[in-house]
Every structure is written in structure tokens, then in C-alpha cells.
């Protein structure tokens, strides 16, 4: 069955434009930077940055601890973004909301992004962060058995 000229034109209009991911990820990073918002109600949680060292570089981790919550679980969160976009800044609101909604401490990992950092940089950073969080769980106010690894999209893969 042939597609009519009118249908072909409609499909063309409704189709996604051709995107060169090798170029568009830089634009996506800038858009995320502009859209990332600081925390809505900082009285609901305590936030601090905690670097983890992996070889010769540090891996930033941002901790979101709900205020007034006794020892609970810690959600070690790896952000999404196709391994090329996303940061702990762009996920601030998500992590803060997650901490408030669950009553759990959330530790967001800012792993190195491709293509500037080739595989296996991202999984190595995530492993270093997980190792440090498990080793020093008590300093985050949790027991090791209450540390849960979670991720969004590419972060779930990591």
C-alpha cells in the first residue's frame, strides 16, 4: 500500500527533526543548567556536598537529609541523562523531593560524563561513591544494610 503525498507531508511535519547527538548534548547541558532550580523549602532537609576520592580525581556527592528524621535508609542516587547530560545540580529538586517524600537520606552522585570521559569513567565513579557510602554509612546516620542503590534512566544502568 502506497502512502499518499498528503500523508507523507503530514508524517514529515509530525516527525522529530534530525538531531546530531554528538552536537546536541552540549546544548542540552546548557538548557539543564538554566532550568535547574535551587531547593524550594530548605527547612525540610539539610544539604551538603561530600567529595569521594577515586584515583586522582574526586567524585562529588550531594547529601539530602530530611530534617527531624531519625536514622533511616540512604538512597544512593545515580542521575539520568544518557551518560552525557545531567548533574547533581539539575537533579536537586528531584533529590530533595525524594528525601522529603520517603523520609530517607538521598546521596546524589555527580559521575563523569561522556564523551569527555570515556567508558568506564562513569561506572568507576559510581563504584567509588557506593564503596565510600557503604564504608562510612554511620557518618550519614544509616546502617550499611539500609543503603539502597537507585537511578533514573542511564543512572539506573550504572
What kind of feature is each model-predicted range?
Residues 71-81:
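Short beta-strand element of the alpha/beta-hydrolase
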Residues 1-63:
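A glycine/proline-hinged amphipathic helix-loop "lid/cap" segment
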Residues 61, 76-78, 98, 119-158:
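Short strand-loop-helix active-site module centered on a catalytic nucleophile
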Residues 88-109:
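Short amphipathic alpha-helix adjacent to the substrate-entry channel of hydrolases
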Amino acid at each position: 500500500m502506497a502512502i499518499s503525498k498528503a500523508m507523507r507531508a503530514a508524517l514529515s511535519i509530525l516527525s522529530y527533526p534530525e538531531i546530531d547527538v554528538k552536537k546536541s548534548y552540549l546544548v542540552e547541558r546548557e538548557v539543564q543548567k538554566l532550568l535547574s532550580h535551587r531547593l524550594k523549602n530548605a527547612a525540610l532537609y539539610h544539604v551538603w556536598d561530600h567529595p569521594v576520592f577515586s584515583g586522582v580525581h574526586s567524585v562529588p556527592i550531594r547529601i539530602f537529609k530530611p530534617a527531624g528524621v531519625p536514622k533511616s535508609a540512604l538512597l544512593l542516587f545515580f542521575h539520568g541523562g544518557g551518560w552525557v547530560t545531567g548533574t547533581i545540580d539539575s537533579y536537586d529538586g528531584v533529590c530533595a523531593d525524594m528525601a522529603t517524600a520517603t523520609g530517607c537520606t538521598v546521596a546524589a552522585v555527580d559521575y563523569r560524563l561522556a564523551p569527555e570521559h570515556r567508558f568506564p569513567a562513569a561506572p568507576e565513579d559510581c563504584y567509588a561513591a557506593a564503596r565510600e557510602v557503604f564504608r562510612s554509612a554511620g557518618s550519614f546516620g544509616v546502617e550499611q544494610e539500609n543503603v539502597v542503590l537507585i537511578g533514573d534512566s542511564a543512572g539506573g544502568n550504572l
